[in-house]
Amino acid sequence: MLKYFGTDGVRGEANKVLTPEMAFKLGRMGGYVLTKEKEDGGQARVLVSRDTRISGEMLEHALISGLLSVGIEVLECGVMTTPGLSYLVQAQGADAGVQISASHNPVEDNGIKFFGSNGLKLSDAKEEEIEELIDTKQDMLPRPSAEGLGTVTDFRDGSNKYIQFLENTIPEDLSGIKVVIDGANGAASAFISRLFADLDVDFTTISTHLNGLNINDHCGATHTARLQEEVVKQGAQLGLAFDGDADRCIAVDENGNEVDGDHIMYVIGSYLADHGRLKKDTIVTTVMSNLGFTKALERRGIKNVRTQVGDRYVSEEMRANGYSLGGEQSGHVIISDYHNTGDGMLTGLHLMLVMKKTGKSLTELLADFKEYPQVLVNVPVKDKNSWKNHQAVVDAIDSVEKDMAGNGRVLVRPSGTQELLRVMAEGPTQEITQEYVDRIVKVVTTEMGE
């Protein structure tokens, strides 16, 4: 069990949990681990970027100081999306990248996420190596001086390369589709107008007024209410919402209904399959994807491979078996023909491309997708990882699954960040599904409750 790194890097309340001191250590120790085996013996290069949080610059300066202290050349990208940084690390042939962002979390939080030279998140083993160095009582890492110290190069124009990359994935303009775009007052906000104007999109934007304090504040991929209203009000065919670092995309259809990652993958995957471009006719998702998604894919002859929760695990499964599309219900979508990580803006563009190529609305494209009602309850418990040892809990789950008779599913899993057990079920109706969950929750509370 890692001490500092969670499922998406190191996160916490900025200046209290994630302090400048910790950022310095992460820069120093992380930079060393990622560049110590540089084969050509030259100076290592690491790209650093951040989202729009007020704490970003504070942590950025501390992190960069740590990198410089072990002799690393830093390319400072300024405000950049997380997938944008991942792309630039590969495009520049850099040794690593570091993104300062807490993604969809509130402004009080921030995070530090490392990428290897391949633009991918680090393995658990690499993160563990960094943690061991952080916790070592005496810092024995190299301390170069004079010409051995690292330097900083301004690389804010790297955003131009990233935008050009996104545009090059679209074979034609996207004129004829009216779209409202929610930038979450985050990293994508700086690039939306340039990107969508270049592709002749008829678009308006909301939540792109940056002040360092309003990122994800009742906007973006986790708060789509305003976007839903604007799509209907403006008579748009589509709404696109990104989160703070734009690795997610959630859509809104022409009627103002939210369209999550499952639905987006269904639309893009169906189009790719119809044109022989969905590798192995398979879409990779996590265990959280709706049962209706799997059944809709089956009707189209598309397979659904599931992993544990986390886009890292989706990405690993895709790379290991040569799949080309995968993601999460939350809006992380990986289109590996173009990028090896979830990219909200790339996802939004390709959703629009399917609409233009088919001449269909989102409602029409999703006509065969019948979502199963889902109920999720988070139960406070004493030991979230011990639930399988409680026979009464196991029996309650088995009883519910037997009653479902194949027309539903149960998923019980520990929270990745809190002492909670998540009990989720999907079934034929909301009422029946709620009853299923209540039965399990009652037993969990009795057996494991605080």
From Swiss-Prot:
The keyword Cytoplasm does not apply. Binds 1 Mg(2+) ion per subunit. Keywords: Isomerase, Magnesium, Metal-binding, Phosphoprotein. It catalyses: alpha-D-glucosamine 1-phosphate = D-glucosamine 6-phosphate. Activated by phosphorylation. It is an enzyme of class 5 (isomerase). The modification Phosphoserine is found at residue 103. Its cofactor is Mg(2+). Pfam families: PGM_PMM_I (PF02878), PGM_PMM_II (PF02879), PGM_PMM_III (PF02880), PGM_PMM_IV (PF00408). It comes from the Bacteria. GO terms for biological process: carbohydrate metabolic process; peptidoglycan biosynthetic process; UDP-N-acetylglucosamine biosynthetic process. The keyword Phosphoprotein applies. One of its GO terms (cellular component) is cytosol. Mg(2+) binds at residues 103, 243, 245, 247. Belongs to the phosphohexose mutase family. PANTHER family: PHOSPHOGLUCOMUTASE (ALPHA-D-GLUCOSE-1,6-BISPHOSPHATE-DEPENDENT), PHOSPHOHEXOSE MUTASE. Catalyzes the conversion of glucosamine-6-phosphate to glucosamine-1-phosphate. HAMAP family: GlmM_B. This is Phosphoglucosamine mutase.
